[in-house]
Amino acid sequence: MAPGTLTELAGESKLNSKFVRDEDERPKVAYNVFSDEIPVISLAGIDDVDGKRGEICRQIVEACENWGIFQVVDHGVDTNLVADMTRLARDFFALPPEDKLRFDMSGGKKGGFIVSSHLQGEAVQDWREIVTYFSYPVRNRDYSRWPDKPEGWVKVTEEYSERLMSLACKLLEVLSEAMGLEKESLTNACVDMDQKIVVNYYPKCPQPDLTLGLKRHTDPGTITLLLQDQVGGLQATRDNGKTWITVQPVEGAFVVNLGDHGHFLSNGRFKNADHQAVVNSNSSRLSIATFQNPAPDATVYPLKVREGEKAILEEPITFAEMYKRKMGRDLELARLKKLAKEERDHKEVDKPVDQIFA
């Protein structure tokens, strides 16, 4: 799609064909049919070694083994900071298109604004707008790609990034200890942890049953922390897409999910959350995803293989190579789906009119 916004498309009565997904990819559960299967865990007392820490750690480990996804409350991130970050994000997407498009990141730019981030070659696009920026390592920050509107964006997002980095490392400590390792092991395996923040805006959609806000995927990195509003739309599956649940929004909570890197480091013990985002025709939705990723040259290989197990990777590889392979598989799948769609469309064109509308 050429640079632009979804604003004008959101007001149409029919969904643009660029967003219409094949039937097997369409939502099976509505955005507001919530499930309470995803654990909500209070972190109050997690620093009390002789207090509640043991029970909190047990709950986190169980959630990672069963789902790879859970929610945390009492996490220590200031509520005013969360409110400011949310307000600024909403204000950014309410800006006139020309203000957002000053930070257009199409064409390979690192950071900024884009409509429907998707793999090159994909036939179908996601129904979302995003603004993204890279906040760690600090030395690599390119403030020219960070929005300068609304006022206060940089100051608040810097503080938010710092607090989320701290929370992510604390959660990785828990998982390291559960694996029988030193508590810094998972963080150290990232070498020089990268942090990317993606603010997602999902406008109202004229035909939400035909599309997705964000297609089904697992995150490539170590761990992701998601702040979402109360609308609903985040969905997860743990049976390879046979059944989906919509995660119940919890005020002030962060949804935490493990990525592929975390999955491999645990030798498959902790699941990489399989998830997607659906949209609706009643209201827009906002979410802020903080991706904690390893450095490109970090090693991807199990940190510990338990007795009786085999390593789930044949050999160590770098995160850059792991990511390249993942994107390669996704691109090939997208190419095959695009060819299949073109073939179906071609057959429809070749049909007599009376058969097409029969």
From Swiss-Prot:
PROSITE patterns, per the entry: FE2OG_OXY (PS51471)
Cofactor notes: Binds 1 Fe(2+) ion per subunit.
InterPro entries xref list: DIOX_N (IPR026992), IPNS-like_FE2OG_OXY (IPR044861), IPNS-like_sf (IPR027443), Oxoglu/Fe-dep_dioxygenase_dom (IPR005123), Plant_2OG-oxidoreductases (IPR050295)
Top-level class of the enzyme under EC nomenclature: oxidoreductase
Outcome of mutating residue 158 to K: In strain: cv. Me-0, cv. Mh-0, cv. Per-1 and cv. Ws-0
Recorded superkingdom: Eukaryota
GO molecular function: ATP binding; flavanone 3-dioxygenase activity; L-ascorbic acid binding; metal ion binding
Keyword tRNA processing on entry: no
Cofactor(s) the record lists: Fe(2+); L-ascorbate
Residues the record lists as binding Fe cation: 217, 219, 275
Keyword Iron: yes
Sequence positions that bind 2-oxoglutarate: 285
Cited PANTHER family: OXOGLUTARATE/IRON-DEPENDENT DIOXYGENASE (PTHR47991)
Free-text function comment from the UniProt entry: Catalyzes the 3-beta-hydroxylation of 2S-flavanones to 2R,3R-dihydroflavonols which are intermediates in the biosynthesis of flavonols, anthocyanidins, catechins and proanthocyanidins in plants.
Family to which the UniProt record says this protein belongs: Belongs to the iron/ascorbate-dependent oxidoreductase family.
Quaternary structure and interacting proteins, as annotated: Interacts with Dihydroflavonol-4-reductase (TT3), chalcone synthase (TT4) and chalcone isomerase (TT5) to form a flavonoid enzyme complex.
Protein's UniProt name: Naringenin,2-oxoglutarate 3-dioxygenase
The organism of origin for this protein: Arabidopsis thaliana (Mouse-ear cress)
Gene name linked to the record: F3H
